[in-house]
Curated annotation (Swiss-Prot):
Residues 5-128 form the Glycine radical domain. Keywords: Organic radical. The lineage of its organism: Bacteria, Pseudomonadati, Pseudomonadota, Gammaproteobacteria, Pasteurellales. GO terms for cellular component: cytosol. This is Autonomous glycyl radical cofactor. GO terms for molecular function: formate C-acetyltransferase activity.
């Protein structure tokens, strides 16, 4: 658990009246504010480096962190293979045919023939 403190007594004058977050599980102290140039904001040190101190606790609201690592992306095109193949052969019949490619909406007829073949190949598979 993280505890917020204001140091009220210390033999090190740079620590007096400074504010810290103490993480006893990690044995770390993070400087929030201190006078002088000895301790910088966000500097992390071992709690033991603070030495003998007296402090008063300061209320701290710790918001839970959400870590997003990776993720999944799904593009959905609701149509049949035959429709796209016919659009390749007869583009004039499908001037408004719009598909999703990498999150973007694009007119199928604006793609190059190679891109059209790639979309058909990647969109329609026998199994996952």
């Amino acid at each position: 658990m993280i505890k917020g403190v204001q140091i009220t007594e210390s033999s090190n004058s740079n620590l007096v009246n400074s504010f810290w977050l103490l993480d006893e599980e990690k044995n770390e102290a993070r400087c929030i504010a201190a006078k002088g140039d000895v301790y910088k904001e966000d500097q992390v040190i071992a709690i033991s480096e603070l030495g003998q101190i007296a402090y008063r606790e300061v209320p701290v609201n710790v918001a839970p962190t959400i870590k997003v690592e990776g993720g999944q992306h799904l593009n959905v095109n609701v149509l049949r293979r035959e429709t796209l193949e016919d659009a390749v052969k007869n583009p004039e019949k499908y001037p408004q045919l719009t598909i999703r490619v990498s999150g973007y909406a694009v007119r199928f007829n604006s793609l190059t023939p190679e891109q059209q073949r790639d979309v058909i190949t990647r969109t329609f598979t026998e199994s996952l």
